[in-house]
Each structure stands twice: as structure tokens, then as C-alpha cells.
Amino acid sequence: MGKKKKRATEKVWCYYCDREFDDEKILVQHQKAKHFKCHVCHKKLSTASGMVIHVLQVHKENVTKVPNAKDGRDSTDIEIYGMQGIPPHVLTAHYGEEEDEPPAKVAKVEIPSAPLGGVVPRPYGMVYPPQQVPGAVPARPMYYPGPPMRHPAPVWQMPPPRPQQWYPQNPALSVPPAAHLGYRPQPLFPVQNMGMTPTPTSAPAIQPSPVTGVTPPGIPTSSPAMPVPQPLFPVVNNSIPSQAPPFSAPLPVGGAQQPSHADALGSADAYPPNNSIPGGTNAHSYASGPNTSGPSIGPPPVIANKAPSNQPNEVYLVWDDEAMSMEERRMSLPKYKVHDETSQMNSINAAIDRRISESRLAGRMAF
């Protein structure tokens, strides 16, 4: 714990005006002359409350503020005499010291982060406690009977399994199995006429050791047949003739016949390209020609006299009515017609006359 600093030079100062003095007696004389002096008879009093009582009893006046004081420190409720009676927070703010001391610093403990590969194995018979904080009492190691030391048996590492294919395969095409060792990945899209040599369809099987005659555990005597991945999207080009696969699969044990070249072509044609658009890629949708017989109520006519552009599925709207614009056509519709007041009054009068005649006719029929 740190010791609290003592004020080397505690100068006295006035609470009302923050003026510093060398002696408290001089401060008291200053307060009597500047802050506790009656403004009527100029009598010097000792405290602010004494000044208030004097002015009230003698001069019949009320004093609510201490004269010649700063804003916020002119209250007459606080009893000040020299340095006595000053609130603690004002003293703290004046001397620039904090009321509470900062907490003691805690020693920072750094835990070394060692990689997993660099951990040294410990003997079976002892368990070491974790690293202790400096200054704490270390715990004693604990002992327990452990299993006898044995040499670990040699473990043959298996090669990582290949990921499964998530795209469907074409059942009509015969895909030869690829060897597990010496596998060469196929491209995403089939590349033709590139002059590439085919990958060997099989690799020599692992032979047993000539000395022991035992195959190492975990490795099969013959590599399993792995399917060759097919392209993600089947691509068929009509300009390039389809070719047979550079290699063929071995005949199965059952003696099934290998599919012919015609079957392979038929199965390849079963997957048409997805970019086929009815009417061609440059097809456009054109409306019928304009109706030049006369103005008609309805949407404006559409004409397509422009040559088709490269962008597909476009509709060109052209207003070809030279006698009437789109606004005039809209104003000719009954929905947008505007009636004048004369026609409206005539229609109202006609409706009233019709009602009167109907009522008279109904009265005659009642008799």
C-alpha cells in the first residue's frame, strides 16, 4: 500500500474568492473586510450568518448572498471562519488530490503457450500440478500406481479416404475404375483433342514381404477400384464428333458385355445442354402491328420494326399514331372525361322530372 502524500506547503486560501494567503490571521481579516462587512453601516463581522442577523435586526433588510464571492460559493448557509467549515470536496478540488487511492497493482502472470508437438511426455507414476501464481504456496505432486510401460505397436498409416461424389453419374456410360495409387484427377469439363496420354487403369498391387510373407496391416493386397469423377455439367458440342473414352473398363466377372460406341453416344445425348432457348438465343418477342383504322379505347398499340439486337427476350414499344398522342388518347377514355356544369344540371333536372312523373303515375294507379 502506498503512503498518502502530505502537502508540503499548505497555503491558506479564501473559500469565497480562492485567494491564497500566508497566514490564517490575514485570511480572517480579509474575510471580515471583503465578505462579512455590512453594506449599510460598514461594520465588520466574523461570519456570514452574523452579518445576515445584523442586517436583519438593525437595518431590517434581508441578505441572501455573500458579497464579493464567486458563483456557487455565495451561500450564507455555510458557516466559514478562516479555513474552518470548508466542505471536503472543495478542499479536494482545490489541492488536486483524489479522495480514494488507486488500488494496488496486481502482478501480471504470463502463461506460456507451448505447441502441442513440443510437449514432453511425463512418466506414469507422477502427476504434476499446474503452474502456480508467483507468491502462492506450491502444491505437492501426487503419486498413483500407473500401468506398466509398454512399447507401442507399430501402426501403419492409412491414406486419407477420397471424398464422395455429390453429382449424379450417367449409368449408361461405362467409367473404368481408377487405381488408388497413382491417381490423376480428371478435369471439371472434358477436354478433347488435347493429345494427353491416358492414365494407367491399374497400379501394381502391394506384394507381401519376401522375408515374412505377411502383408502390412491396414493396406489391402489389391487397391480398391475408385470411380473416375465425371464433369460437373455435361457439355455436348455438335461441331466436334463424340469420341470413345481413351480407356475402357475391364470386363466384370459375370461376363457382361462392354457397351458399344453407339450406346455411349446415345447416353451422352441424353443430357441436352441447358442453354437451349425456344426460338434461338437471339429470339425476340414482337407484338402485332398498329391498328391504323381509327382511335380505339385500350392500351396503345405496339410495333416492332427494329432489327433484333443481341439481347434476348426484349419487347419494343413504339407509339406510331401521328394523329393523336398518348395524352389525348387517355383523355378520350370515358374514365377521364370532364363534364361541364350545364350538362350536369341538365342531367339532374331530367332525373328529378323522371322521379316526379313516376310518383304521379304511382298515385293514379293507387286509386
UniProtKB/Swiss-Prot annotation:
One of the protein's GO biological processes: negative regulation of flower development
Induction conditions: Not regulated by photoperiod or vernalization.
Biased composition (Polar residues): 273-295
Keyword flag Nucleus: yes
PROSITE patterns: ZF_BED (PS50808)
Tissue specificity field: Expressed in root, shoot apex, leaves, stem and flowers. Expressed in expanding leaves, in the vasculature of fully expanded leaves, in the inflorescence, throughout young floral primordia, in the carpels of older flowers and in fertilized ovules.
Subcellular locations according to the entry: Nucleus
Stretch list, region Disordered: 246-309
UniProt zinc finger (BED-type) residues: 7-66
Xref: InterPro entries: Znf_BED (IPR003656), Znf_C2H2_sf (IPR036236), Znf_C2H2_type (IPR013087)
Superkingdom of source: Eukaryota
GO cellular component: nucleus
Keywords, in A-Z order: Developmental protein, Differentiation, DNA-binding, Flowering, Metal-binding, Nucleus, Zinc, Zinc-finger
Free-text function comment from the UniProt entry: Sequence-specific DNA binding factor that recognizes the 5'-CCAAATTTTAAGTTT-3' sequence. Recruits the FRI-C complex to the FLC promoter. Required for FRI-mediated FLC activation, but has no effect on the expression of MAF1, MAF2, MAF3, MAF5, UFC and CO. Dispensable for the reactivation of FLC in early embryogenesis, but required to maintain high levels of FLC expression in later embryonic and vegetative development.
Assembly: Homodimer. Component of the transcription activator complex FRI-C composed of FRI, FRL1, SUF4, FLX and FES1. Interacts with LD, ASHH2, FRL1, (via C-terminus) with FRI (via C-terminus), and with SWC6, a component of the SWR1 chromatin-remodeling complex. Binds to MED18 to regulate flowering time; recruits MED18 to FLC promoter.
PANTHER family attached to this UniProt entry: BUB3-INTERACTING AND GLEBS MOTIF-CONTAINING PROTEIN ZNF207 (PTHR23215:SF0), ZINC FINGER PROTEIN 207 (PTHR23215)
Name of the protein: Protein SUPPRESSOR OF FRI 4
Organism, scientific name: Arabidopsis thaliana
Lineage: Eukaryota, Viridiplantae, Streptophyta, Embryophyta, Tracheophyta
Gene name as annotated: SUF4
